[in-house]
Amino acid sequence: MSRYTGSIYKKSRRLGFSLLENNKEFNSGKKRTYGPGQHGNKKVKLSNYGQQLVEKQKLMFLYGLNDRQFRRLYRVALGRPGVLTLNLLQVLESRLDSLVYRAGFAPTRRAARQLVNHSHVLVNNKKVNIPSALVEVGSTIALKAKSLEIPLIKNTLNKPADFIELIDKEKKVAKLARLPERNELPADVNEAYVVEWYNRLM
């Protein structure tokens, strides 16, 4: 399964979940705030399998992953001590593209992924252009000096997440101070269903 590159608005409405994390897709000014298609406004009772699938898709589309990438990260979470459901979310948030977004350096996760892909990002003062790279606690994340003039970056004024320490606001330097707690992550995801899904397959 390839990574989804279609309309975020349509996918958010279908899942009933804001992939932009700001509910912009469901604003009352939008033409439609329900799922796309002829029967998009009908409520359907999902089976346990259907619920697992929806919750897995929420995380896959939120973090811009395909199934192979998600399985790999699930195995990483499985190998860590602690609660598997929280481990999974923490691993997802430890991806470089996610941290660039959480640091407030990009307006969306997609934009953050593009910044990493185009070699605008440094981790511990070394260029890293792999969005899926996992960043360890204590590592610094920064944008290259020449990248600071890019309009997308200059116009992004998002506040960093609480688990990100902003070292230099002007030069766009931050540090992953700690792993996030569950209450700092998307509330409208039931990650227990995702664990059930992969426990059944692996």
From Swiss-Prot:
GO terms for molecular function: rRNA binding; structural constituent of ribosome. Residues 94-157 form the S4 RNA-binding domain. Pfam families: Ribosomal_S4, S4. GO terms for biological process: ribosomal small subunit biogenesis; translation. The keyword Cell inner membrane does not apply. One of its GO terms (cellular component) is small ribosomal subunit. Keywords: Ribonucleoprotein, Ribosomal protein, RNA-binding, rRNA-binding. Part of the 30S ribosomal subunit. Contacts protein S5. The interaction surface between S4 and S5 is involved in control of translational fidelity. One of the primary rRNA binding proteins, it binds directly to 16S rRNA where it nucleates assembly of the body of the 30S subunit. Belongs to the universal ribosomal protein uS4 family. NCBIfam families: PRK05327.1, rpsD_bact. This is Small ribosomal subunit protein uS4. It comes from Ureaplasma parvum serovar 3 (strain ATCC 700970). The lineage of its organism: Bacteria, Bacillati, Mycoplasmatota, Mycoplasmoidales, Mycoplasmoidaceae.
